[in-house]
């Protein structure tokens, strides 16, 4: 094999000796995925799960179609697969359904952006240090709820070029979440790549303190980039010194190795560059595809525990989403009431104000004769209760009432509770 020099983003990388096993490795080695029609029998497959996966919902960055990659994982003998799109979770439901249909367990996650300081700070720093990457996986339904809160806070409070969160948010919503240190853009890896080992250790200990012992893992990746070879060596050392376990991942951005060129064009669209531009963002080496368990085991033969840990993590992650069921938030009612009695109280109170001439039997004398308004109210309330919308009507009453009290105009609604 001839020596080669490649470009990864704006850094020139040359072939380097693999520090971990002493073998010479070319940084730009050509890899190809197994044939598309290859099916691994269960007895041939090994326990491995991809935990770092970007789909088409990582806009202009991931090109893996959800239906395609879930089927591919199944073909390669895996029984579970994660989704970890950049900063968003709007692909989770489609992924969950597709994974179930493919016969594999969906692991719901997100690769979030972590601000180096407060999420509220909106001042530009060094381009590399505006945010760090961190992979979060929901271990259970509590973790799934917390993960949604983390991502939402990134948009509502921390958005600055990217939806960022900070250590405060991670600490507040850490329960039920497993964290991985991510790629070279992760905080730990970024320090290590700069030769700042002690700073990397402090970052790792901080994340472990946030998520708890056994819930934070140091992430090994190898895409043929020489910097990763050095960082991986430091991560192995750090794992031994801090007793933080390793996990092996492939930073999947497309499903098959032959999709690399199409993905490169997608990056050009994202960055406004031409394919022929030399100094532009690119994912060199063609290794960001859904690799087989055998490929991953060979790539990380020096750290078999990191491979095993992918499956152990997958076994821990169990989120169940129920579809076809109306889920209404519970309205907090005053002491002495439940939702049903409080809605009745408000309705009868309003009835007395609107119809002061109503008699004790609930009858009013209209132009069309005697009309029992109380019977009508009781019927409407029974329908609301039967449909399970008691709390919903209280919620709508609450914000409409707040608007009226605070001088916010409220208009008639068409076909909605607000206009009732």
Can you say where each PLM-predicted feature lies in the sequence?
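Phosphodiester-processing cores and adjacent nucleic acid-binding clamps
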Residues: 23, 27-31, 36-420
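Accessible peptide chain termini
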Residues: 1-2, 310
């Amino acid at each position: 094999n001839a020596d080669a020099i490649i470009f990864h983003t704006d850094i020139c990388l040359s072939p380097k000796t693999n520090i971990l096993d002493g073998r010479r490795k070319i940084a730009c080695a050509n890899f190809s995925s197994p044939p598309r029609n290859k099916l691994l029998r269960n007895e041939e497959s090994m326990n491995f799960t991809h935990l770092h996966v970007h789909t088409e919902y990582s806009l202009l960055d991931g090109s893996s179609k959800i239906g395609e990659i879930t089927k591919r994982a199944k073909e390669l003998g895996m029984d579970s697969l994660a989704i970890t799109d950049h900063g968003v979770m709007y692909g989770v439901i489609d992924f969950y359904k597709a994974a179930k249909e493919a016969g594999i367990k969906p692991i719901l996650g997100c690769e979030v952006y972590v601000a180096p300081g407060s999420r509220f700070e909106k001042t530009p720093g060094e381009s590399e240090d505006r945010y760090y990457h961190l992979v979060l996986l929901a271990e259970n339904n509590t973790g799934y709820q917390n993960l949604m809160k983390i991502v939402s806070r990134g948009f509502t409070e921390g958005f600055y070029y990217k939806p960022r969160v900070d250590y405060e948010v991670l600490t507040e919503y850490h329960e039920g979440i497993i964290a991985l240190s991510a790629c070279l853009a992760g905080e730990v890896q970024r320090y290590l790549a700069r030769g700042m080992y002690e700073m990397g250790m402090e970052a790792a200990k901080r994340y472990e303190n946030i998520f708890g012992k056994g819930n934070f893992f140091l992430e090994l990746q190898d895409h043929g980039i020489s910097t990763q070879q050095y960082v991986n060596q430091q991560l192995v050392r750090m794992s031994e010194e801090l007793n933080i376990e390793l996990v092996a991942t492939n930073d999947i951005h497309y499903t098959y190795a032959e999709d690399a060129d199409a993905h490169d064009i997608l990056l050009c669209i994202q960055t406004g560059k031409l394919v022929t531009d030399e100094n532009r963002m690119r994912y060199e080496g063609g290794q960001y595809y859904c690799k087989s368990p055998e490929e991953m085991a060979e790539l990380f033969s020096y750290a078999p525990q990191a491979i095993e840990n992918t499956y152990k993590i997958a076994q821990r992650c169990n989120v169940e989403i129920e579809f076809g069921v109306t889920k209404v938030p519970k309205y907090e009612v005053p002491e002495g009431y439940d939702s049903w009695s409080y809605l009745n109280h408000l309705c009868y109170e309003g009835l007395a104000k609107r119809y002061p001439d109503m008699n004790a039997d609930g009858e009013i004398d209209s132009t069309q004769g005697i009309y029992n308004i109380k019977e009508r109210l009781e019927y409407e309330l029974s329908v609301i209760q039967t449909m399970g919308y008691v709390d919903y009507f209280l919620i709508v009453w609450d914000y409409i009432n707040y608007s009226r009290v605070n001088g916010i105009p409220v208009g008639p609604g068409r076909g909605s509770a607000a206009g009732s």
